[in-house]
Amino acid sequence: MKPIFSKIRVLGTAALALFLTASCSDILDEQPRSSYDPTFFKTEKGVEGGVTSMYAHLRYIYGQAYYYNSCLTGTDEATWGWSADGNFKDADLSGVGNLTATTCRSDALWGTAFSNINTANGVIENGAEVGVNESLVSEARFFRAFDYFLLVQTFGGVPLDLGSGELKFNITPSRTSVRNTVPEVYTKAIFPDLLTAIENLPANPRVTGGVTKTVARLYLAKAYLTYAWWLKNPNNIPTYPECQRTDPDGHDAAWYFQQAYDVAVTAIENPGPFGLQESFWMVSAGPNDRNMEILLYADHTQEDEYYNGGSLSYGGGVLPITLPDG
């Protein structure tokens, strides 16, 4: 019987080898659905998804408590309450806390804005290649300018190079960065993006609460006005990084004040679907929260926490808070 067992072992080994060879001949074609890699931006669906995420990112700024904390704590408008921790005490005017670079809640804006800026970079770089209309790409241009405008008002000069070059989509982790000056942020990023957006965006929103020419004009007028005041600097407020308060294009504060006025007038004379409400009550009434005065918003749902982006019953500080009215 020994030869028979030997033959069985040989045949079994050969069969196993044949099975392994056949099973490993094809490379597994992965189709990840819970996460995305940078090549997703090389597809039309990826570009469209990137633009959609930019509306959602508004919730993670204006819908989270720590952003408002970073705006109000440390002023005479608010103080810490009985259950407050260091998030609220550290920046309080009373000096009850210890404010440092690691205890302030500036991350509420910094982290959210820069991740969205990189997404916008990816959309802008790849949009034309995958055949997406420039009007959709200009929505990304608007949001990139939107975030840089928030950042430059809060921190002064901030990096335009996230690791792959100025205003380039970055996929390489980096622990260092170089902060551009305030004039560079305005003249290289904010103004060009908004001007291009105005030229290509529609008068009527593509989606409910979406970006339009009127919205872009509003932010361009605000950016011109803010930059003009920075150039004028009547109170001699220091800036960071230190730089001369001169415009790279040779314009002075008066020129930018005039530009702000002209853009605002154009927006008023060409409002699109927007207009003023008849009374302040109509602006503030809960059932009327999608009225003609609302130029931009990220809508939410009170039916599904996944699509809402935050709890429908609990406010945790970081996640968007959209609790039921009442």
PLM feature segments, named:
Residues C24-S70, T100, F280:
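Membrane-proximal, proline-rich intrinsically disordered regions
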Residues V152-Q153, P159, P205, A223-N235:
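Short coil/turn linking the two alpha-helices of tandem helical-hairpin repeats
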Residues K45-G46, V51, Y55, Y62, ...:
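Elongated scaffold/linker segments in the mid-to-C-terminal portions of large proteins
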Residues K2-G12:
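Bacterial N-terminal signal peptides that target proteins for export
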Residues E44, E48-Y62, S83-F155, T172-G210:
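Conserved, well-structured interaction surfaces
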Residues G157-R179, P183, W230-Q259:
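Short coil/linker segments at helix-helix boundaries
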Residues Q258-E269:
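TPR/TPR-like (Sel1-like) alpha-helical repeat modules
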Residues G12-T21:
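Bacterial N-terminal signal peptides
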